[in-house]
Amino acid sequence: MKSISIMQPHFFPWFGYFELIKNSDLFIFLDDIEFPHRSYVNRVKFQFQNKIDWLSLPIKRDSNKLIKDVKLFNKKENFELLKKKISYSLKKNKNYHLVDRILNEIPIEEIFTINEFNKFTIKAIASIIFKKKIKFLDYAGRLQ
């Protein structure tokens, strides 16, 4: 029996999200629905020093946009700030080299939406932590 999972493309999702991907034969990004404001699509709770705060990548605030159409705001500058925050917080972690590798592989020049950013990072993380090939489907039903 084949298993299919469907989730919105979250911003640096939690471990359970990746367990769902791992246990699926096909994973579908649900990104052709309205962008849910104040959600995990563009932010996540993250530990900085000894406190928990929000880590996010700012987006352009347009109402009634689909997730796949929400554009990043000042993407180059904000991405550099994001990398610095993550690096500062995780540089002592034994697996930091993997995080650093993913952050440096993100083609920020070619990414224009939060959807593209999230899908790239989710697939990059999944490729590192899983040995099996995962099939991903986009909003138009195309394999990625």
Where are these regions (language model features)?
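Residues lining hydrophobic/aromatic ligand-binding pockets adjacent to catalytic sites
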Residues: M1-Q144
